[in-house]
Swiss-Prot record:
<feature type="binding site">
    <location>
        <position position="12"/>
    </location>
    <ligand>
        <name>[4Fe-4S] cluster</name>
    </ligand>
</feature>
<feature type="binding site">
    <location>
        <position position="122"/>
    </location>
    <ligand>
        <name>isopentenyl diphosphate</name>
    </ligand>
</feature>
<keyword id="KW-0479">Metal-binding</keyword>
<dbReference type="GO" id="GO:0051745">
    <property type="term" value="F:4-hydroxy-3-methylbut-2-enyl diphosphate reductase activity"/>
</dbReference>
<feature type="binding site">
    <location>
        <position position="188"/>
    </location>
    <ligand>
        <name>[4Fe-4S] cluster</name>
    </ligand>
</feature>
<feature type="active site" description="Proton donor">
    <location>
        <position position="124"/>
    </location>
</feature>
<keyword id="KW-0004">4Fe-4S</keyword>
<dbReference type="GO" id="GO:0046872">
    <property type="term" value="F:metal ion binding"/>
</dbReference>
<dbReference type="GO" id="GO:0051539">
    <property type="term" value="F:4 iron, 4 sulfur cluster binding"/>
</dbReference>
<protein>
    <recommendedName>
        <fullName>4-hydroxy-3-methylbut-2-enyl diphosphate reductase</fullName>
        <ecNumber>1.17.7.4</ecNumber>
    </recommendedName>
</protein>
<feature type="binding site">
    <location>
        <position position="218"/>
    </location>
    <ligand>
        <name>isopentenyl diphosphate</name>
    </ligand>
</feature>
<comment type="function">
    <text>Catalyzes the conversion of 1-hydroxy-2-methyl-2-(E)-butenyl 4-diphosphate (HMBPP) into a mixture of isopentenyl diphosphate (IPP) and dimethylallyl diphosphate (DMAPP). Acts in the terminal step of the DOXP/MEP pathway for isoprenoid precursor biosynthesis.</text>
</comment>
<feature type="binding site">
    <location>
        <position position="218"/>
    </location>
    <ligand>
        <name>(2E)-4-hydroxy-3-methylbut-2-enyl diphosphate</name>
    </ligand>
</feature>
<feature type="binding site">
    <location>
        <position position="72"/>
    </location>
    <ligand>
        <name>dimethylallyl diphosphate</name>
    </ligand>
</feature>
<feature type="binding site">
    <location>
        <position position="259"/>
    </location>
    <ligand>
        <name>isopentenyl diphosphate</name>
    </ligand>
</feature>
<feature type="binding site">
    <location>
        <position position="40"/>
    </location>
    <ligand>
        <name>isopentenyl diphosphate</name>
    </ligand>
</feature>
<feature type="binding site">
    <location>
        <position position="72"/>
    </location>
    <ligand>
        <name>isopentenyl diphosphate</name>
    </ligand>
</feature>
Length: 283
């Protein structure tokens, strides 16, 4: 069996920084909570929980604790609320997400109507929207654009894990909605690279495994890209893999979301190796 692994795989730089900060604060404080799931991968959250990094529930309120802002960021009002209760706040927001928040606030302050191309209910988008005083417009579907009024000044930013191709399609449809339109490409370069690798894999393999959390936006987009071309399976746990998907002469593609740990790739390879001898290629 030939296995083609898209590189890079494992955590992106933003996820690495977020987890590193959480572990550092845990070592200093002995107890730490994250405001929502630190990253969108249940396996990773479970491992962090075992170490003592706990996820604070939506309706849970704590005082005088060490709290970490998740990688996707938070609305500023939420951060201010937890600060008011005497908590120490440590910001693990991905630097690229932070950049989008700053841009959104800048555009709002300079009288631009801010348009965010992204998923309405995604934590990152909710956080970005808060920096427009919730006056921005979120475009998730092309049908959302029909409702957009004409504005003298429009500023466009993107959820960092958006598909580049889909984002550009939406931008083209927005171009007649304003006189002055400023576009900031805030899609994460690492996300774009993985999307391109997914396209490349789809031309090589006859079955693909996308490894990562089912709640991960960037992982879902990798799945969509590959599934348009080849049989594709989104795998969150090893138990989900069915050996009947493979044959000895299969060409299997493996790609990971940005919050998928390296050791999960190794576990999947070990399982495949137990079925057939492997010939591994990096793509």
């Amino acid at each position: 069996m030939k296995v083609y692994i898209a590189t890079p795989y494992g955590f992106c730089s933003g996820v690495k920084k977020s987890i590193s900060l959480a572990e550092k604060i845990l070592s200093l404080k002995g107890e730490v909570y994250t405001l929502g799931a630190l990253v969108h991968n249940p396996k990773v959250i479970e491992e962090l929980s075992k170490k003592g990094i706990k996820v604070l529930g939506k309706d849970e309120i704590v005082e005088g604790k060490a709290l970490i802002v998740r990688a996707h960021g938070l609305p500023q009002r939420d951060i201010d609320f937890y600060k008011s209760l005497g908590n120490e706040i440590y910001d693990a927001t991905c630097p690229l997400v932070k950049k989008v928040q700053v841009l959104a606030e800048y555009l709002k302050n300079n009288k631009y109507k801010v348009i965010i191309i992204g998923e309405k209910n995604h934590p990152e988008v909710i956080g970005i929207l808060s920096y427009t005083d919730n006056q921005g417009i979120v475009i998730e579907y092309e049908s959302d654009i029909e409702k957009v009024e004409y504005y003298p000044k429009i500023g466009i930013v993107f959820q960092t894990t958006q598909s580049f191709d889909n984002a550009i399609q939406k931008v083209n449809l927005i171009m007649n909605k304003g006189k002055e339109i400023r576009i900031f490409n805030t899609i994460c370069p690492e996300t774009i690279e993985r999307q391109e690798k997914a396209k490349k894999l789809s031309k090589i393999v006859d079955v693909a495994l996308v490894l990562g959390g089912k709640n991960s936006a960037n992982t879902r987009r990798l799945y969509i890209t590959l599934s348009l071309k080849v049989p594709t399976y989104h795998i969150e746990n090893l138990e989900e893999i069915d050996k009947n998907w493979f044959k000895e002469d299969s060409k299997v593609g493996i790609i990971t979301g940005t919050s998928t740990p390296n050791n999960f790739v190794e576990e999947v390879l070990a399982l495949l190796k137990s079925l057939y001898p492997l010939e591994i290629h990096l793509v």
